[in-house]
Amino acid sequence: MILAVVIFALVIGSVIFHFASPWWFTDIVSQWDSIDGVISITFWITGAVFVLCNLFLAYCVYKFRQKPGHKAVYEPENHKLESWLSAITTVGVIAMLAPGLFVWADFVTVPEEATEYEVMGQQWQWNFRYPGADGKLGTADTEFISELNPFGINPEDPNGMDDIVVNAPEMHLPIGKPVKALLRSNDVLHNYTVPQFRVKMDMVPGLVSYLWFQPEVTGRYDILCEELCGIGHFIMRGAVVIDTQEDYDAWIASKPTFAETQAMAAPDLAAGQAQYAVCASCHGAGGEGNQALNAPKLSGLQDWYIERQLNHFKTGVRGQTEGDQYGASMVGMANMLVDDTAVRNMSAYIASLPDVPAQPTIQGDIANGADIYDRNCAACHLDKRNGTWYTDAPKLSGMNDWYFVTQIKNFRSGIRGLHAADPYGEQMVSMATAMAAKNTDDTKEMEDVAAYLNTIR
């Protein structure tokens, strides 16, 4: 009797939990309502089977419970019952699978008017490419991939010269027009997913997979990787913005073509040196930094990282958060650089300065720091702690240990990295938070990592 009541309560509780639960699909913003329909059919069929089977089980437990003088009847076969069960099961399976076949046929049949764009997935970032005025994407291959050509576009293919490249994890699409996403992976298995679109597809190295959809609602939606791709899988986030046609045209016009990125003039180091004179008062003539002024060492950092941080200070991505008083002082300094060329010149000059390792100021448990670094940081910043453009991770070895500790604290507390225009900072917030502490003293943990970083000078 008790078991029958428990089974009955389990059924009622499961049904209530499902309908009262806040965990359900996001609102759909594409034309793929049919996918939701197929899922609903599967839910109702399996849900009905779950309820009926368990209620029948509860009934049997109660009805045929052991009683004095009752003896179970042995019936090895019941052909009539087996036939009915087989028939009902067959109908149920067909009812679940058949609609999916029709939806799949639509999924693999891309409309002729669909516009193509390319998604490049790599650990742990998203980049995007759009066809230029000719409406065609140029060919690409991994042999051409470099810091200046992260998509591996074939420089000999004229169709690729006007391709619009977006080396950032945010893409835009116009509303109401079908689009076909060509999916490439630069390293391991990834998966391109926007939950609100209802479609997803694996990205396999060496292959070009695809999916298509038609955006129906303007807004900003998360891009997720739903294929385990390494330690940074959980921070592989991006965004797709569905625009009006006017807003989309303005956005796409602001992005460079592949030809423009390859023809960019070399930075003027002399001009950068002249501009750096103001910075030298805090950061030192050789970029060696000054802890007394909370000015970190700059020499040794990559030019692309310096350029990004200067632009972040100029645009308010950094230095505007409450509690970031030192970052706030950099806002005015960065805005002395009048345009992108000035920022590039300054960044290139700083990157050209001799890299003299900073003197250690922090002591810590090097073995513990090495363990924490290897588990959390090495995948992006590399074993030698010199960083790489591939993962947009700056150099850490030979830099100021006190500044490293300060910035990890800032990431953990949300002072840095939470601005919507700082996707790599957002990744660092997640990684800094996820660094496994073996004790309750977070500062000691950071100092241990800093001490380990100091072992390579």
What are these regions (language model features)?
Residues M1-F19, A48-L55:
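Alpha-helical transmembrane segments of integral membrane proteins, especially early/N-terminal helices
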Residues V15-I39, V61-A266:
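Non-transmembrane, membrane-proximal soluble domains of secreted or membrane proteins
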Residues P215, E227, Q273-H283, N294-R308, ...:
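Extended non-catalytic domains of envelope/secretory-pathway proteins
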Residues M236, N290-K297, F313-R344, I350-L353, ...:
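Axial heme c-ligation environment in periplasmic c-type cytochrome domains
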Residues V241-F258, D340-A358:
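Short, structured interface segments
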Residues E260-N290, Q302, T341, T361-N386, ...:
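Sequence/structural segment immediately N-terminal to covalent heme-attachment motifs in c-type
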Residues G300-D303, Q309, G398-N400, Q407:
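Extracellular/lumenal glycan-associated surfaces
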